[in-house]
């Protein structure tokens, strides 16, 4: 396990971690945006949303997400879809390799997991086009596993909370933020905890000097708050 002290990061004690979890989740329960993929625990639906949200804005994704699941309501439907229909469903989102990889992953699920979406982080991470972040998101949201989902928003929040002086854009530093999240993640509500941090990063702890610190529910324990 990574020793965070070697990177100049001092973690909170158990009481402060518990308080942080409560405060963040209370805020999320009150303030979270009502998004269609937050109304389900279906791993297939969550997977579709996570892939679509890569490099695409939330409001743009919503109609595509709803149409895609209307056209391909199950993993089997996606695995067997004609390429022309598949690409038509994705038209306008760009980065077509995303949907091609999704179909390959759906075929993996049919062949290797008897058509059942895998329910462990390790097996989810074996699917084509799924990296550590997406595997963590699906594992925690759909299956309640205490697996962090560490994306750019989450790394920015962590960097400010703990005054981490390592570039979040450098892939080799991801392990630092992963180690922080391994400690912080709420074991009882891991999916909501991950989504709460993503929501905080997307709506309050904004990049490029426009963070809304006065609206932040966890400003009291943030080293970056001045």
Please identify what each model-predicted range represents:
Residues 224-225:
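Acidic, metal-coordinating catalytic segment for phosphate/diphosphate chemistry
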Residues 1-6:
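N-terminal amphipathic/basic-hydrophobic helices that include classical n-h-c signal peptides
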Residues 8-15, 23, 27-214, 218-221:
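Catalytic cores of DNA base-excision repair glycosylases
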